[in-house]
């Protein structure tokens, strides 16, 4: 295969043993699998070694977000093309074949948004599909800012896989428990407070922001079609907004 038609899979990990074996099995036919581990204390590194991955370590230090490690990892990759995969995401054979076909085209894009199927309480959540994420790109044209949930910046043409191509979507296995979601809500709202420390919200925001997030998820995005898990998910979306606003108020008194 032409050197320019090789793909490195980059996976950032921190105590990611739960799904890692399945995730790595799914990407075994790519040219390189690079694990960028953030000082895991479980069996993550052991699993990666068993799959013959190349492993680099990113010291967590003061970081409590993954984005700085993503920037480091993509530029540690050996190949021009990089596919970033989370440690709870499965790449389908159809997606792999699609990517290799794409990069052989003369006028292929420099970056690609890929749809993702999210699961909650064991159920595919239609309300969160297609959840496009920019995860495939030329590494030399890409910079990943050190901002939580930030989209990588690609200097070039970026395209998007159509939502109807569900066979090309990542399978997102997170399937978080309520306990994990509450834990992440605490983490994410803490980070959001840092980013919005100079922003102010009125009293009515305590009502309309949680309600609108619930309404948007349950009605506009269609969680109502996802049964009881859809209702619970919509409530949790509103809960996130309420916790953020409550913490914001707490800071001001």
Model regions and ranges:
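A conserved acidic beta->alpha catalytic loop
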Residues: 26, 37-46
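Acidic helix N-cap motif at the loop->helix transition within catalytic regions
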Residues: 18-21, 42-51, 94-95
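Short aromatic/hydrophobic "clamp" motif used to bind/position activated sugar donors
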Residues: 82
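Conserved donor nucleotide-binding strand/loop of the catalytic core
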Residues: 45-78
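Short beta-strand/loop segment that forms part of the nucleotide-sugar
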Residues: 30-40, 56-58, 87
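Short, well-formed alpha-helical segments that are part of the catalytic scaffolds
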Residues: 10-29
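Catalytic-site signature of metal-activated, phosphate-bearing donor transferases
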Residues: 67-74, 85, 92-251
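Cell-envelope/extracellular polymer assembly enzymes that use nucleotide-activated donors
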Residues: 6-8, 32
């Amino acid at each position: 295969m032409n050197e320019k038609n090789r793909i490195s899979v980059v996976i950032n990990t921190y105590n990611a043993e739960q799904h890692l074996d399945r995730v790595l099995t799914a990407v075994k036919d790519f040219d390189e699998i690079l694990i960028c581990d953030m000082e895991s204390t479980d069996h993550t590194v052991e699993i990666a070694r068993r799959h013959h991955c190349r492993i680099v370590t990113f010291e967590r230090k003061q970081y409590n977000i993954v984005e700085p490690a993503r920037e480091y990892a993509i530029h540690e990759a050996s190949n021009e093309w990089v596919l970033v995969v989370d440690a709870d995401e499965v790449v389908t054979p159809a997606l792999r074949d699609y990517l290799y076909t794409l990069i052989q085209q003369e006028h292929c894009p420099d970056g690609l948004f890929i749809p993702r199927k999210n699961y909650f309480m064991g159920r595919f959540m239609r309300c969160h599909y297609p959840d496009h994420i920019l995860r495939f790109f030329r590494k030399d044209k890409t910079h990943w800012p050190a901002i939580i949930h930030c989209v990588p910046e690609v200097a070039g043409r970026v395209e998007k896989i159509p939502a109807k191509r569900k066979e090309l979507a990542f399978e997102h296995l997170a399937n978080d428990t309520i306990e994990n979601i509450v834990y992440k809500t605490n983490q994410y709202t803490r980070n959001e407070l840092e980013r919005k420390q100079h922003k102010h919200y009125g009293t009515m925001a305590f009502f309309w922001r949680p309600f609108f997030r619930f309404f948007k998820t349950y009605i506009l995005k269609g969680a109502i079609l996802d049964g009881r898990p859809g209702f619970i998910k919509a409530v949790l979306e509103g809960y996130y907004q309420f916790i953020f606003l409550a913490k914001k108020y707490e800071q001001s008194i």
